[in-house]
């Protein structure tokens, strides 16, 4: 893990993720105001699916921006961009961290409503709405990055 993170981890279960994303969807009502969703790949694909279902939106685009290599944040690379200025669109990502990706998204889609499920202090001012505050130094373990594994008991016979 990068030197900027402490040992603190925030582990997100599928149930928590779904509950928080549905709360975000409620804040985006009425659904009729939206033309579509732009998911920031890859983390934004998961909340985009929930938002699309809850808001009955069928038009889902992607913007693919690479900024992490494993758990290290690096240079931004736009791999694919939805062709719109964002008017009438929700742009969604799972998390805003330092704000580097968010700044690029804002530049690309200035008229979009930009939302995330989780936000850290450095990035939070760059988006329009989010559900959960996360301390800047805390690493988030998203459910799509985890597997269920056996953990041996602390006490052995």
UniProtKB/Swiss-Prot annotation:
Xanthine binds at residues 97, 140. InterPro entries: PRibTrfase_dom (IPR000836), PRTase-like (IPR029057), Xanthine_Guanine_PRibTrfase (IPR023747). GMP binds at residues 97-101, 139-140. Gene3D superfamilies: 3.40.50.2020. It catalyses: GMP + diphosphate = guanine + 5-phospho-alpha-D-ribose 1-diphosphate; XMP + diphosphate = xanthine + 5-phospho-alpha-D-ribose 1-diphosphate; IMP + diphosphate = hypoxanthine + 5-phospho-alpha-D-ribose 1-diphosphate. GO terms for cellular component: cytosol; plasma membrane. Pathway: Purine metabolism; GMP biosynthesis via salvage pathway; GMP from guanine: step 1/1; Purine metabolism; XMP biosynthesis via salvage pathway; XMP from xanthine: step 1/1. 5-phospho-alpha-D-ribose 1-diphosphate binds at residues 42-43, 93-101. Pfam families: Pribosyltran. Keywords: Cell inner membrane, Cell membrane, Glycosyltransferase, Magnesium, Membrane, Metal-binding, Purine salvage, Transferase. Its EC number is 2.4.2.-, 2.4.2.22. The keyword rRNA-binding does not apply. It is a peripheral membrane protein. Mg(2+) binds at residue 94. Guanine binds at residues 97, 140. One of its GO terms (biological process) is IMP salvage. It is found in: Cell inner membrane. GO terms for molecular function: guanine phosphoribosyltransferase activity; hypoxanthine phosphoribosyltransferase activity; magnesium ion binding; xanthine phosphoribosyltransferase activity. Its cofactor is Mg(2+). Purine salvage pathway enzyme that catalyzes the transfer of the ribosyl-5-phosphate group from 5-phospho-alpha-D-ribose 1-diphosphate (PRPP) to the N9 position of the 6-oxopurines guanine and xanthine to form the corresponding ribonucleotides GMP (guanosine 5'-monophosphate) and XMP (xanthosine 5'-monophosphate), with the release of PPi. To a lesser extent, also acts on hypoxanthine. Belongs to the purine/pyrimidine phosphoribosyltransferase family. XGPT subfamily. Homotetramer. This is Xanthine-guanine phosphoribosyltransferase.
């Amino acid at each position: 893990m990068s030197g900027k993170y402490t040992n603190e981890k925030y582990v997100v279960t599928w149930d928590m993720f779904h509950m928080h994303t549905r709360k975000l969807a409620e804040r985006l009502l009425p659904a009729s105001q939206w033309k579509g969703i732009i998911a920031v790949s890859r983390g934004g694909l998961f909340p985009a699916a929930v938002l699309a279902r809850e808001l009955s939106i069928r038009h889902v685009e992607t913007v693919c921006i690479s900024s992490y290599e494993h758990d290290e944040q690096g240079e931004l690379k736009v791999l694919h961009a939805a062709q719109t200025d964002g008017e009438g669109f929700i742009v969604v990502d799972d998390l805003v961290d330092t704000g580097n990706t968010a700044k690029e998204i804002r530049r690309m889609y200035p008229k979009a409503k930009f939302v995330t499920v989780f936000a850290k202090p450095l990035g939070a001012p760059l988006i329009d709405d989010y559900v959960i505050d996360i301390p800047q130094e805390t690493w988030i373990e998203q459910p799509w990055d985890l597997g269920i594994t056996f953990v041996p008991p602390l006490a052995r016979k």
